[in-house]
UniProtKB/Swiss-Prot annotation:
Keywords: ATP-binding, Cell membrane, Glycoprotein, Lipid transport, Magnesium, Membrane, Metal-binding, Nucleotide-binding, Translocase, Transmembrane, Transmembrane helix, Transport. Residues 18-30 have a biased composition (Polar residues). It comes from Rattus norvegicus (Rat). ABCG5 and ABCG8 form an obligate heterodimer that mediates Mg(2+)- and ATP-dependent sterol transport across the cell membrane. Plays an essential role in the selective transport of dietary plant sterols and cholesterol in and out of the enterocytes and in the selective sterol excretion by the liver into bile. Required for normal sterol homeostasis. The heterodimer with ABCG8 has ATPase activity. The lineage of its organism: Eukaryota, Metazoa, Chordata, Craniata, Vertebrata. This is ATP-binding cassette sub-family G member 5. Heterodimer with ABCG8. GO terms for biological process: cholesterol efflux; cholesterol homeostasis; negative regulation of intestinal cholesterol absorption; negative regulation of intestinal phytosterol absorption; response to ionizing radiation; response to muscle activity; response to nutrient; response to nutrient levels. Its EC number is 7.6.2.-.
Length: 652
């Protein structure tokens, strides 16, 4: 086959070419002084058990079949080299990276071995050795690029000097050509920020802060235009030249990138069809009778050649046989034998360097918590809409109540009791819901960030949860005081300053409980909309059972009465009822005494309503406060446990 103009290796790599198939770990380093490293993957297979039918079909759901996602995959790569893993969707590219990085969940069966410098790593060592960049870039949108990297450095590295972090961040900003956007916001779809390519480089920069020697990137060019994708790949090639191992999965690379990669691997249905240098690829497929046509993109040509066409049964059988032929030819080729020889050789060399773990000198638990708290606070404080809604959403609800009730009366004929009961019912029912709205809107992004950063070993998920809780407390207190100050005095509730304080404290608790209950559920349920529905259902149910406003508690069935003791609404309602009705005197028209002929005027004092609705609540006032506020630390501790379990399940 005639050599194509864009396939010339000299124009792409020149003297930096480092593609030898034989191991060169004992020949020196890429940079002349640093030790060379190697990564070997030997006969890695992964299978999972899938249920035959859907969950509602009990018979077929009980039946399982084993699905082989990876089948005896073997790779070898050294420092200074970049490997590109090609394959169509579902070919096993991401699963292979997960297997190499130790991130595969234990719900499947993993076989085979992964060696770094000839040493087989334990599962708990992969996180400290391999840097893994996922497809999606997850950032806090209101932070600048410099702040994002600085907080990451502060979470990963211990130092008593601020200059240390500044120098570390400046170094990676320069290395990845991000200095010109260092002080720009990351941004999101709501407001502009840096470009997609720059976001990808920020993700890479965050990984470089710990100086990893093995970097893996899953689809780093997804969603980028051709020119930006080309720049990202060239950047990764340059990073590999600095004594790093770089492995990337790419779905559809440009032809100009063909000779920039030192190794190219092709996966089809979990089987390795080829793995070698670009020159070896051209020769291998040429010998198999499939030369790349002139002026064709070799990536596209070989991807089509090694894919199974499922448009028709005949084409599927034909293309699958071709793939099986190519896979068999590769396993019998000298290229495959050299891979296995290199892996075996590195396992027995005595002069190999130590395993290249990332820089690991993390700060203490409380230092990390402080960094997370500062980061969360700075990010959310810059979002004006978030700050305003946090402070005034309760007030907006209160204004509707004011416009509706105007001012409560002491005249029984004008609904003195009914208006107060309706008001308290709305207050206890709505405040948890506003707390839930805060958590549903703000925490999912923090959860996504913590899911990614905790897998990188920066901190544990419960620490992010606790940072959010500490951040939310002052906002909730201020918002409740603003709401109470306007509503309490405007609506004409019991005119006493101490009662106003009790009123505010009683409404702060359900607001926090609603928000923290939502956090607990967000640790168990991924979809925020489902969490929204669950919290709303629990809030309404608790209000019906525990308040005593809809049905007298003494007349409830015993199971519901017992269940009411586990609802925070019971204690909150009793506090508010005592706080408002104790010492209150009613009138009936112009009379201060009861009118026997008028059932609406049967009460003259608020204590009568207390004993009818919440018997004994007056003597339990302090106890109710203690029980009500005990829900808050209970939910926080439960949330920490849930996120600890979430951490474990994601890493399984």
């Amino acid at each position: 086959m005639s050599e194509l103009p864009f396939l010339s290796p000299e124009g792409a790599r020149g003297p930096h070419n480092n593609r030898g198939s034989q191991s060169s770990l004992e020949e020196g380093s890429v940079t002349g002084s640093e030790a060379r490293h190697s990564l070997g993957v030997l006969n890695v297979s992964f299978s999972v058990s899938n249920r035959v039918g859907p969950w509602w079909n009990i018979k077929s759901c009980q039946q399982k079949w084993d699905r082989k996602i990876l089948k005896d995959v073997s790779l070898y790569i050294e420092s200074g080299q970049t490997m590109c893993i090609l394959g169509s969707s579902g070919s096993g590219k991401t699963t292979l990276l997960d297997a190499i990085s130790g991130r595969l969940r234990r719900t499947g069966t993993l076989e085979g071995e992964v060696f770094v410098n000839g040493c087989e790593l334990r599962r708990d060592q992969f996180q400290d050795c391999v840097s893994y960049l996922l497809q999606s870039d997850v950032f806090l949108s209101s932070l600048t690029v410099r702040e994002t990297l600085r907080y990451t450095a502060m979470l990963a590295l211990r130092s008593s000097s601020a200059d240390f972090y500044d120098k570390k961040v400046e170094a990676v900003l320069t290395e990845l050509s991000l200095s010109h956007v260092a002080d720009q916001m990351i941004g999101n779809y709501n407001f502009g920020g840096i470009s997609s390519g720059e976001r990808r480089r920020v993700s890479i920069a965050a990984q470089l802060l710990q100086d990893p020697k093995v970097m893996m990137l899953d689809e780093p060019t997804t969603g980028l235009d051709c020119m930006t994708a080309n720049h990202i790949v060239l950047l990764l090639v340059e990073l590999a030249r600095r004594n790093r191992i770089v492995i990337v999965t790419i779905h559809q690379p440009r032809s100009e990138l063909f000779h920039h990669f030192d190794k190219i691997a092709i996966l089809t249905y979990g089987e390795l069809v080829f793995c070698g240098t670009p020159e070896e690829m051209l020769g291998f497929f040429n010998n198999c009778g499939y030369p790349c046509p002139e002026h064709s993109n070799p990536f596209d040509f070989y991807m089509d050649l090694t894919s199974v066409d499922t448009q028709s049964r005949e084409r599927e059988i034909e293309t699958y046989k071709r793939v099986q032929m190519l896979e068999s030819a590769f396993r019998q080729s000298d290229i495959c034998h050299k891979i296995l020889e290199n892996i075996e050789r590195t396992r027995h060399l005595k002069t190999l360097p130590m395993v290249p773990f990332k820089t690991k000198n993390p700060p203490g638990m409380f230092c990390k918590l402080g960094v997370l708290l500062r980061r969360v606070t700075r990010n959310l404080m810059r979002n004006k809409q978030v700050v305003i809604m946090r402070l005034v959403q309760n007030l907006i609800m209160g204004l509707f109540l004011i416009f509706y009730l105007l001012r409560v009366q002491n005249n029984m004929l004008k609904g003195a009791v009914q208006d107060r009961v309706g008001l308290l019912y709305q207050l206890v029912g709505a405040t948890p819901y506003t707390g839930m709205l805060n958590a549903v809107n703000l925490f999912p992004m923090l959860r996504a960030v913590s899911d990614q950063e905790s897998q990188d070993g920066l901190y544990q998920k419960w620490q992010m949860l606790l940072a959010y809780v500490l951040h939310a407390l002052p906002f909730s207190i201020v918002a409740t005081v603003i709401f109470s100050s306007v509503c309490y005095w405007t609506l004409g509730l019991y005119p006493e300053v101490a009662r106003f304080g009790y009123f505010s404290a009683a409404l702060l608790a359900p607001h926090l409980i609603g928000e923290f209950l939502t956090l607990v559920l967000l640790g168990m349920v991924q979809n925020p909309n489902i969490v929204n529905s669950i919290v709303a259902l629990l809030s309404i149910s608790g209000l019906l059972i525990g308040s005593g406003f809809i049905r007298n508690i003494e007349e409830m069935p015993i199971p519901l009465k017992i269940l009411g003791y586990f609802t925070f609404q019971k204690y909150c309602c009793e506090i508010l009822v005592v706080n408002e009705f104790y010492g209150l005197n009613f009138t009936c028209g112009g009379s201060n005494t009861s009118v026997p002929n008028n059932p609406m005027c049967s009460m003259t004092q608020g204590i009568q309503f207390i004993e009818k609705t919440c018997p004994g609540a007056t003597s339990r006032f302090t106890t109710n406060f203690l029980i009500l506020y005990s829900f808050i630390p209970t939910l926080v501790i439960l949330g920490m446990v849930v996120f600890k379990v979430r951490d474990y399940l994601i890493s399984r």
